[in-house]
Swiss-Prot record:
Cofactors: Mg(2+)
Active-site residues from the entry: D172
Gene: NEK6
Stretches the record annotates as Disordered: 1-33
Modified residues (Phosphoserine): S37, S206
Region (Interaction with APBB1): 267-270
Enzyme Commission number(s) of this protein: 2.7.11.34
Protein name according to UniProt: Serine/threonine-protein kinase Nek6
Cellular localization per UniProt: Cytoplasm; Nucleus; Nucleus speckle; Cytoplasm, Cytoskeleton, Microtubule organizing center, Centrosome
Sequence positions bearing Phosphothreonine: T202, T210
Entry domain remark: Displays an autoinhibited conformation: Tyr-108 side chain points into the active site, interacts with the activation loop, and blocks the alphaC helix. The autoinhibitory conformation is released upon binding with NEK9.
């Protein structure tokens, strides 16, 4: 969804978006495990235009007819093809995502199932993303100043720390999912739900796009954990400095990419342009053993210190 408007604040309540009165006795969620919301339906939205397309979903700019708020409406197209447990877990996870409330995270406002299709309502505002900024600097043949790197990275760390403190992993941190407003505010979006899709459903899509941010534990199918988000943060910090992924290579196949990732084989960042602290943090995050990577509290602390230091020099 690079180059598309992001799902970001455009007014509206941080609580459920649709405020139509519920029944006198709301349905018991235990008896309806797939029921996310009983208050919204597609009839409550006027869809204006498509603003993005993901691997498994489409995103539309829409207006909620109940309060006239402009939102992003994400329709998960393959929800009906997911197995029953994946559906239930996905619904549960979205419930957790709706509880996140942080200035650097795109807010999940509401969600509902209609015609066997999952619909997610998100905050929206027009903005660019980090991948666009990286492409711009690359085209200009200029490096991103270190103070700018820390200005955005510290906000991203704040968002991830909020998620991790609530035991929620992002699972898909990459430049295209880091949106930047016109006033320089970072908004982390597209919180990863892809793991809920069944292997049969996703098999044909698993190699769509080169997974440059894939961690060694994912290559070995050892499962995703909080330290996998740290690996992705390290890759993103590196890419902001080098203007390309640490494991990028021309004409590289998936096997050679996996080899480079397992060996942490990437070109060093230029010492004459970036501080030792930045280069050190990258190497700590892009580390093969997840248990040896720092936690988000440490990464955020370093980012705060460096943001203050580079802003004052």
């Amino acid at each position: 969804m690079a180059g598309q408007p992001s799902h970001m604040p455009h007014g509206g309540s941080p609580n459920n978006l649709c405020h139509t009165p519920g029944p006198a006795h709301p349905p018991d969620p235990q008896r309806h495990p797939n029921a996310l919301s009983f208050r919204c339906s597609l009839a409550d939205f006027q869809i204006e235009k498509k603003i993005g397309r993901g691997q498994f979903s489409e995103v539309y700019k829409a207006t909620c007819l109940l309060d006239r708020k402009t939102v992003a409406l994400k329709k998960v197209q393959i929800f009906e093809m997911m197995d029953a447990k994946a559906r239930q877990d996905c619904v549960k996870e979205i419930g957790l995502l709706k509880q996140l409330n942080h200035p650097n995270i795109i807010k999940y406002l509401d969600s509902f199932i209609e015609d066997n299709e999952l619909n997610i309502v998100l905050e929206l505002a027009d903005a660019g993303d980090l991948s666009q900024m990286i492409k711009y600097f690359k085209k200009q043949k200029r490096l991103i100043p270190e103070r700018t790197v820390w200005k955005y990275f510290v906000q991203l760390c704040s968002a991830v720390e909020h998620m991790h403190s609530r035991r929620v992993m992002h699972r898909d941190i990459k430049p295209a999912n880091v949106f930047i407003t016109a006033t320089g505010i970072v908004k982390l979006g597209d919180l990863g739900l892809g793991r809920f899709f069944s292997s049969e459903t996703t098999a044909a899509h698993s190699l769509v796009g080169t997974p440059y941010y894939m961690s060694p534990e994912r290559i070995h199918e050892n499962g995703y954990n909080f330290k996998s988000d740290i690996w992705s943060l390290g890759c993103l910090l590196y890419e902001m400095a080098a203007l390309q992924s640490p494991f990028y290579g021309d004409k590289m196949n998936l096997f050679s990419l996996c080899q480079k990732i397992e060996q942490c084989d990437y070109p060093p960042l230029p010492g004459e342009h970036y501080s030792e602290k930045l280069r050190e943090l990258v190497s700590m995050c892009i580390y093969p053993d997840p248990n040896q990577r720092p936690d988000i509290g440490y990464v955020h602390q370093v980012a705060r210190q460096m943001h203050v230091w580079t802003s004052s020099t």
